[in-house]
Curated annotation (Swiss-Prot):
Plays a regulatory role in gas vesicle synthesis, activates transcription of the gvpA operon, and probably of the gvpD operon. Gas vesicles are hollow, gas filled proteinaceous nanostructures found in several microbial planktonic microorganisms. They allow positioning of halobacteria at the optimal depth for growth in the poorly aerated, shallow brine pools of their habitat. Expression of a 9.5 kb p-vac DNA fragment containing 2 divergently transcribed regions (gvpD-gvpE-gvpF-gvpG-gvpH-gvpI-gvpJ-gvpK-gvpL-gvpM and gvpA-gvpC-gvpN-gvpO) allows H.volcanii to produce gas vesicles. A similar region restores gas vesicle production in H.halobium without the p-vac locus, but it still has the c-vac locus. This is Transcriptional activator GvpE1. It comes from Halobacterium salinarum (strain ATCC 700922 / JCM 11081 / NRC-1). Disruption phenotype: Partially gas vesicle-deficient. A single gvpE1 deletion is partially gas vesicle deficient, still transcribes gvpA1. A double gvpD1-gvpE1 deletion is partially gas vesicle-deficient, still transcribes gvpA1. Keywords: Cytoplasm, DNA-binding, Plasmid.
């Protein structure tokens, strides 16, 4: 027995990475080892599989400096929720398609936002109903992709322009108020 183990160990590449998720094991256990795609030709089942993936190096490079940024983590969940549609569209673009679980993880990593699936999924469904997103329904999840990237970018660009204008106006009004308050206090001390 020991000789057999040594022989098997010698055949195994120690540097090989073996990866699986608990859900993979659970689905095998529940199905008694039967394939979900046993009734399909081999290639058809392969196109319907989707594996959760971390952000690619290209995606991380796109968002470099933004991920796990302490300053972005100060943005409240309420503000993230208010602009969730545009944020989701950008995250889906960066990933070139994503499932809801990945988007929730990205929101947490980008903004420190602890949003529930009950907050995010209705927005994804609404965007799909509006035709902004295409949905690929798989056995255990949905994968969302932009149906019209240019239209989505136009929508996001418009929203960002409005936010910038709104922020600039608020900043200008606040600066005026502070200046008037300061002048008012200066006159009171001179009197």
């Amino acid at each position: 027995m020991d000789d057999l183990l040594e022989e098997l160990t010698a055949d195994i590449d120690a540097n090989a990475a073996i990866s699986f998720a608990v859900t993979d094991l659970e689905s095998v256990i529940e199905s008694d080892g039967a394939s979900d795609h046993a009734d399909q030709p081999p290639d058809e089942g392969a196109t319907q599989r989707y594996t959760d993936t971390p952000l690619t190096d290209d995606a991380v490079a796109t968002m470099d400096g933004w991920l796990d940024n302490d300053q972005l983590h100060t943005i409240s969940d309420a503000i993230v929720t208010e602009h969730i549609d545009e944020i989701l569209l950008l995250l889906i673009t960066v990933r070139d398609g994503a499932c809801g679980k990945e988007l929730l993880q990205d929101l947490r990593r980008l903004f420190g936002a602890d949003l529930s699936p009950g907050t995010v999924y209705p927005h994804l469904n609404d965007l799909a109903v509006e035709g902004v997103l295409e949905v690929q329904k798989l056995s255990k999840r949905k994968v969302y992709r932009l149906s019209d990237p240019e239209g989505a970018f136009t929508r996001i660009d418009h929203m960002v322009d409005q936010l910038l204008l709104f922020s600039l106006v608020l900043k200008a009004v606040m600066t005026d108020c502070k200046a008037r308050q300061s002048q008012s206090q200066g006159r009171e001390t001179n009197d």
